[in-house]
């Protein structure tokens, strides 16, 4: 069974996310959108059940996702190791029902699926332990 982060560690996780958020804002201001997305995806708290942590990290990832204009360029620059976690966040974005977010997530989903294949989708949907 996977180890889950206890609620008392949630404050430490949120503090790390806040630090990460400031770094992402700086990268976005420098038009380093891919670096911002990588930073947002790194250290995502998938093993916590604390919704505050998940929501805080989603906000950071969402900000970076919405800044991406060149999806092919982003995927060329993004390491393969990021594909599965990115797919999870795309589904989280689609679940919001927000039109601009869904549009962006669908565009990225299409290109990511072309690049990573259906296995990426299957791993994302069947992994019920590491959730975003």
From Swiss-Prot:
A Pfam family per the record: P16-Arc
Gene Ontology molecular function: actin binding
Gene3D superfamilies, per database record: Actin-related protein 2/3 complex subunit 5 (1.25.40.190)
Location of the protein in the cell: Cytoplasm, Cytoskeleton; Cell projection
Keywords, alphabetical: Acetylation, Actin-binding, Cell projection, Cytoplasm, Cytoskeleton
GO cellular component: Arp2/3 protein complex; cell projection; cytoplasm
Tissue-level expression: Expressed at low levels in all tissues with a relatively highest expression in inflorescences.
Residues recorded as bearing N-acetylalanine in the entry: 2
Entry keyword annotation includes Mitochondrion: no
Biological process annotations from GO: actin cytoskeleton organization; actin filament organization; actin filament polymerization; Arp2/3 complex-mediated actin nucleation; multidimensional cell growth; regulation of actin filament polymerization; trichome morphogenesis
Recorded phenotype for the gene knockout or disruption: Distorted trichomes and altered epidermal cell types.
Subunit (UniProt): Component of the Arp2/3 complex composed of ARP2, ARP3, ARPC1/p41-ARC, ARPC2/p34-ARC, ARPC3/p21-ARC, ARPC4/p20-ARC and ARPC5/p16-ARC.
Protein family membership: Belongs to the ARPC5 family.
Task of the protein: Functions as a component of the Arp2/3 complex which is involved in regulation of actin polymerization and together with an activating nucleation-promoting factor (NPF) mediates the formation of branched actin networks. Arp2/3 complex plays a critical role in the control of cell morphogenesis via the modulation of cell polarity development.
Protein name in UniProt: Actin-related protein 2/3 complex subunit 5A
Annotated organism of origin: Arabidopsis thaliana
Gene (name only): ARPC5A
């Amino acid at each position: 069974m996977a180890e889950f982060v206890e609620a008392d560690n949630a404050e430490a996780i949120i503090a790390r996310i806040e630090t990460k958020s400031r770094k992402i804002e700086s990268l976005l201001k420098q038009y380093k959108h891919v670096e911002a997305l990588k930073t947002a995806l790194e250290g995502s708290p998938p093993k916590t059940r604390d919704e505050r942590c998940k929501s805080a990290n989603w906000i950071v990832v969402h900000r970076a996702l919405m800044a991406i204009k060149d999806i092919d360029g982003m995927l060329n620059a993004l390491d393969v190791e990021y594909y599965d976690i990115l797919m999870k966040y795309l589904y989280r974005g689609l679940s919001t029902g927000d039109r601009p977010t869904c549009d962006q997530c669908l565009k990225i989903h299409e290109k990511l699926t072309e690049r990573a294949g259906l296995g990426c989708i299957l791993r994302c949907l069947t992994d019920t332990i590491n959730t975003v």
